Amino acid sequence: MEFSQKLYQAAKPIINDIYEDDFIQKMLSGDIGADALRHYLKADAAYLKEFTNLYALLIPKMNSMNDVKFLVEQIEFMVEGEVLAHDILAQIVGESYEEIIKTKVWPPSGDHYIKHMYFQAHSRENAIYTIAAMAPCPYIYAELAKRSQSDHKLNREKDTAKWFDFYSTEMDDIINVFEAIMNKLAESMSDKELEQVKQVFLESCIHERRFFNMAMTLEQWEFGGKVND
């Protein structure tokens, strides 16, 4: 079994939990609230900006010009292509995407996730660690979306179905490239090192779950604690 497949197998329980959590279930039914969608879009805009910067940090670590070219193309996709998925949700809210993200949010779950990825990029020379931190994002979105396509709970009468349709196909290229790079780099690594990479991957899967849940709870920093009247 290739290394990437071992990672996916280990991540299955987490992905199952994400699918059953409120965010995805409400998206499937089309009953998700506008406040949750706004919070998600604002947080995801901040997240994707940093995710794009991480692609730029990966480029110097690449040995293949084909990989460099693909990462440059992915930067363009993050800036332009994925906005299509955001526009779907913004239309459901009834506001333009640009208007929604004018108000920035940086919730704890997004903060911790981004810092986890940056730590790998800056502290590890081997690109496999950075990729292992980044790869769960496209992989989990694709897995959730593909699973939705055969789920009777997917409400085709609601526009949220279009969001699942988008991610059911649009992540395949980056998933394949990340897989190929990780599998190649894994060949020359020890079992102990690969266990560390696996840990990085699974931590990002947990961060993905917390990110979705963040939207449902309208998570924010509570520096003064909660006040109980």
UniProtKB/Swiss-Prot annotation:
EC numbers for this chain:
3.5.99.2
UniProt binding sites for substrate? D44, Y141, Y167
Where is the catalytic site? C137, E208
The answer to whether the entry has keyword Hydrolase is yes
Enzyme class, UniProt record, top EC level: hydrolase
Gene Ontology biological process terms, A to Z: thiamine biosynthetic process; thiamine diphosphate biosynthetic process
GO CC term (a single one): cytosol
**What is the documented function of this protein?**
Catalyzes an amino-pyrimidine hydrolysis reaction at the C5' of the pyrimidine moiety of thiamine compounds, a reaction that is part of a thiamine salvage pathway. Thus, catalyzes the conversion of 4-amino-5-aminomethyl-2-methylpyrimidine to 4-amino-5-hydroxymethyl-2-methylpyrimidine (HMP). Is also able to catalyze the hydrolytic cleavage of thiamine; however, this thiaminase activity may not be physiologically relevant. Therefore, is probably involved in the regeneration of the thiamine pyrimidine from thiamine degraded products present in the environment, rather than in thiamine degradation.
Name of the protein: Aminopyrimidine aminohydrolase
Can you name the source organism?
Answer: Staphylococcus aureus (strain NCTC 8325 / PS 47)
Q: Which gene encodes it?
A: tenA
